[in-house]
Design a protein with these regions (language model features):
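Conserved glycine(s) of the Walker
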Residues: 204
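Hydrophobic positions on the alpha1 helix immediately C-terminal to the Walker A/P-loop
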Residues: 208
Length: 335
């Protein structure tokens, strides 16, 4: 309620300011003043909202009447009442800075039907050009300082895809040195503990979560695509819900201690085994977001991964998409 009241108050004040400004200058035919007025309208009518995910706060700045806010419904459970310490601020702009001298660093794409992300270095900053598919044209431009603290982005395509991608990437990059991993995983909760299911796209992570929910009493879904793992100050490992949950609308602002992490593999026979520390490290390594060639980011991801696999039991599950696989996994990882 406090956030809504403040936003409403700022909206009224900004509109009043613009109205008075127009009354004062309407009769004066001065082009420069009208240009300045348009600039003020844009600045004063912008809206800033703060969100908190896994204990990390970030801000989004967009025009207050922009349709893009309609795509922020998944973020509403994560609204924060004040700024606090922000890990990043992302602002939507109509015009990007000049990037003509950009130098390509790398291109990431996990398949023809997956987003393509091109990373450039440009005037001491990072520039990301993002397309929704491998062969699709660029639809999002994102430029950020090297610390991933201040970002500007321009959207040319789908607002839902663009906003989700920009904020998810910024969150992953900005938290890489903060004992935090943005995972590619489905998470099911049972008896106050959370169980993460890892695996390549199409392996059956969501299916396995649903098998637990449908066959084992008292299970519920926390997140179906991008939960957040965090090593807490006391050394414990907790998993948090996030606004990013893939095709399943599951946006829970809650967190649980991690009971186990399970790497899934499709097979003709159900079989499970405990992973060694090295195996667990590798299994986790391919399941979280971040650029490994940026040394500071890689060091942070490595340190967090080490802490997690040294604390949380990790397993490999060869499985069929059936109830027997769910029971085998549940009975093993909850012992």
């Amino acid at each position: 309620m406090v956030v809504e009241f403040v936003e409403a108050l700022l909206f009224v004040v900004s509109r009043l300011f613009v109205f008075l400004f127009i009354l004062s200058y309407f009769s004066k035919k001065n082009v420069q003043r009208y240009v300045f007025l348009a600039y003020l309208c844009t600045k004063f009518c912008s809206m800033k909202r703060v969100y908190q995910v896994a204990g990390h706060r970030f801000a989004v700045v967009m025009p207050d009447n922009h349709l893009a806010w309609n795509e922020m419904k998944p973020y509403e459970p994560f609204l924060a009442e004040n700024d606090g310490d922000l890990i990043f601020t992302a602002e939507m702009v109509d015009v990007m800075p000049d990037t003509s001298d950009k130098q390509k660093i790398t291109v990431n794409c996990d398949g023809a039907d997956m987003p393509r992300i091109e990373l450039y270095e440009c005037q001491g900053q990072w520039l990301l050009e993002i397309a929704p598919l491998l062969e699709a044209p660029v639809r999002v431009y994102l430029i950020t300082d090297k610390a991933f603290h201040t970002a500007k982005f321009r959207v040319l395509g789908s607002m839902r895809f663009s906003l989700g991608t920009v904020l998810m990437l910024m969150f992953a990059f900005a938290t890489a040195k903060k004992n935090t991993l943005l995972m590619h995983s489905s998470v099911t909760v049972k008896d106050g503990k959370a169980y993460l299911f890892l695996g390549k796209s199409g392996t059956g992570k969501s299916t396995h979560s649903q098998l637990w929910i449908n066959t084992i009493e008292g299970c519920e879904l926390l997140n179906d695509d991008n939960p957040v793992l965090r090593v807490m100050d006391d050394g414990s490992v907790r998993v948090f819900g996030s606004p990013w949950s893939g095709k399943t609308p599951c946006y829970h602002n809650s967190d649980y201690p991690v009971g186990a992490i399970v790497d899934l593999h499709q097979a003709k026979v159900n079989k499970i085994r405990r992973l060694s520390l090295l195996e667990a490290y590798v299994s986790m390594y391919v399941s979280f977001s971040g650029y490994r060639f940026i040394k500071e980011m890689a060091d942070g991801l490595h340190a967090t991964n080490e802490k997690i696999v040294g604390t949380v039991p990790c397993y490999s599950l060869d499985c069929l998409p059936n109830a027997d696989a769910a029971y085998l996994c549940y009975n093993t990882v909850t012992q």
